[in-house]
Regions:
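Short, Lys/Arg-enriched N-terminal segments with co-localized hydrophobic residues
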Residues: 1-12
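Active-site beta->alpha loop and helix N-cap motifs at the rims of alpha/beta catalytic domains
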Residues: 10-112
Length: 112
């Protein structure tokens, strides 16, 4: 997928059906264990908990989730888990933290 296609996809997302972006956006926190590793089991349960409480959209990998402290692999894994456990609830994830544009595009591809 080209860089232009990714940009168009994001632009289309917000102009195509703006009414679909109404509702409650839950900003997902990242649960850490004592050793500072991510507790992915708790994260999956947390995603399900948010959905059960009526969130319309889940924002995984965001400022509230300590995204700047996570590795690219951890960010992708969190977004993947959120997508897996969210059912029909939309998941949004930040994928523009890498310094080089081509690295950002690669992270977006890994999250799709």
């Amino acid at each position: 997928v080209s860089e232009k296609n990714h940009i168009r996809k994001v632009e289309k997302m917000f102009t195509d059906k703006p009414e679909s972006y109404r509702g409650v956006y839950s900003l997902l926190l990242t649960p850490f264990k004592e050793d500072k590793s991510i507790d992915y089991d708790v994260y999956a349960q947390y995603v399900e908990w948010q959905v059960e409480r009526g969130s319309h959209h889940l924002f995984s990998v965001c400022g509230s989730s300590e995204m700047t402290k996570l590795t690219p692999e951890e960010r992708v894994k969190c977004a993947t888990i959120a997508a897996k456990y969210s059912g029909d609830t939309e998941v949004i994830a930040t994928a523009n933290l890498e310094p080089a544009w081509h690295m950002q595009v690669e992270e977006v591809k890994r999250m799709e």
